[in-house]
Amino acid sequence: MNFDSIIKNGLVILENGEQEVEVGIKDGKIAAIGQDLGTSAKIIDAKGSIVSPGMIDAHVHITEPGGGYRDEWEGYDTGTRAAAKGGVTTFIEMPLNQVPATVDEESIQEKFKAGKGKLSVDVASYGGLVPFDLDGGIQELDSNGVVAYKCFLATCGDRSIEGDFMNVDDYSLYEGMKQIAKTGKILSIHAENAAITDKLGEIASKNGETSLRAYVDSRPVFTEVEPIRKIILFAKETGCRVHIVHIACEEGVDEIVKAQQEGVDITCETCTHYLYFYKEELDHIGPVVKCSPPIREQSRLEGMWNRVLNGDISFVTSDHSPCTPDLKATDNAFEAWGGIAGLQNNVDVLFDEGVQKRNMPLSKFAAIIATNPAKRFNLASKGSIAVGKDADFVFIKKDAPYELKAEDLAYRHKISPYIGRKIGAQVVKTILRGVEIYDKEKGISNEKVGRFIP
């Protein structure tokens, strides 16, 4: 067979373990895996690199269109360039922050139009479950190709902005789950108790307690666990498949494992920042590290890592949710925007912290960044290095420490809690459907080969 390109000399993570094999690429697909595949028009030398499936980040916020309200936030151009530089070849875009929120056919088509010609990586879409669009919106989104749905139990959205996202009440959650169950797709849920966290935050602010530690204390662990239990009950009642996003506590994971044992179709993810940062250092870092649910105590880090390593947590995401710098420029944690810019530093941080520091097998690494999200969200052509799959790869150089600087970031706004951190591995090349979209020496390709899925 004549290949368009062949990857040679790398340690390739396959589904049955890592091997020093060659990978032949034809028409954007993996066409062969083996030894001595021959020559081709192009040889991609992976010497010194670990070749992994490109990351599928299942939790990313892009704010385009901005609707005249958020036009200066992260858009498709910079967001997907950062993804490429970070080894992310596909991400699933959340239905909020953009204006209007993605809740029906009109809004998702507006989003597709806004992103046309701007994508460096592939982008799948979430549709939103909101109280104001329970009459037809879910079905319209299904017809327009969303891979899953998303709702919030925590308070969200700006009521002064027409068409902005809104959290669900119990009836909207129940009715939405019944409708989504009929599509066969997954409902991903931000599980925090809105009434309690809002009130505790209000009390702390009135008492002048505005530090990040006070913010964390206003969102205690039980305010994650309680809504997870409710979601499990609703899932049993409606038959809706569910997924808990950005889980930050071991107790919540354990509730999900119990439900799985009872036959509930439920999974969960955590985020890189919950496996890296900890409460005791937050005020030193500043509001750039504020997120929801909050980052918890250092004593919980290994408990969360153990649940990643044993498979209780299915995969890891960034929950990339950047904003303009002014929304982080405050000493009042309750007033700062709650979101972390982390899309570019999933692969390197997770490889360093998981593989290099905690002896995570390479097959498990590939599973948590690519294979498992591909399976959960039915991205059938993605997620593993196997014949017939899309030729999506990230090349990782192990034991290659570097200090992240602001100028290294491809985001629109160069703000991230990872700035100044020494990271012990590097992404050196990213390939999307056979096309090199990032190379450490050449930089990010200006060729916009990404596309919306489907």
From Swiss-Prot:
Keywords: Hydrolase, Metal-binding, Purine metabolism, Zinc. This is Allantoinase. NCBIfam families: allantoinase, PRK08044.1. It comes from Bacillus licheniformis (strain ATCC 14580 / DSM 13 / JCM 2505 / CCUG 7422 / NBRC 12200 / NCIMB 9375 / NCTC 10341 / NRRL NRS-1264 / Gibson 46). Its cofactor is Zn(2+). One of its GO terms (biological process) is purine nucleobase catabolic process. It catalyses: (S)-allantoin + H2O = allantoate + H(+). Belongs to the metallo-dependent hydrolases superfamily. Allantoinase family. Its EC number is 3.5.2.5. HAMAP family: Hydantoinase. Zn(2+) 1 binds at residues 59, 61, 150, 319.
